[in-house]
Amino acid sequence: MTLISTQKLTFEEYLNYQGESGVCYELYRGHLIEMPTPTAIHIKICEFLVYQFRRFFAAHNLPLVAVVTTAVRTEENSSRVPDVVICTRNLWEQVSANPGSAVLDFEEKPLLVIEVTSQNWRDDYIRKRAEYDLIDIPEYWIVDPNLLKIRVCSRPENEGSYSHQEFLPGQQVQSVQFAEFILSVNTLLSPPLVEDLIREEEAQLQQLGQQNQQLEQQNQQLEQQNQQLEQQVNAERQRAERLAQRLREMGGDMDTEL
């Protein structure tokens, strides 16, 4: 981590701090820390996670959001910026309405935070884990593309601190809170571009649209065939009625002659 200044800031000063454009800062016990520029794989993993969580929340009609570049206050004068934050929609709307930096305060607790390891990986495994545990964040993921593993920290019932489970390549990582949210470790550690996923979904939607159009055309053809058959049946019935009427008339004529 890179300390910006030896002069300490309060949490309120941090909220209104105007640093270098494009640079993200954390606050650790009053010290301003410049976060390292993320690598390409770091960005891809974060974008992939946000995309998957948003799809999951939409599919299950959950009032939750997945956001990035959102800070979480962990101590009196400390604030961390997880790579991904999961919180309720109402909470996010409240934070969005506040002036200054987007920061979740003590009473604004996220449901899940995710860190993708980088140069300061020790902070993710030790210091940040302790801070997130201290403020009772229910679930904390550490995605480590260098060691090729994912650590999911959570607090089991009747336990006072985090325990964790690690997921390795070839396995599937599962959220503790969202049991149906399951991802391949291999895919998460080396994810596709979100743009490619969107293109695939668009292609699938177009294919489904074409299939629906074909089914609609087939239904229209069947309806036309049914109408033609109905017309033929009606014509045959009318023909039979005319024939029966003619036979009755002929029978009446014969009775008269006799």
What are these regions (language model features)?
Residues M1-L258:
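Gly/Pro/Ser/Thr-rich low-complexity, intrinsically disordered segments predominantly at protein N-termini
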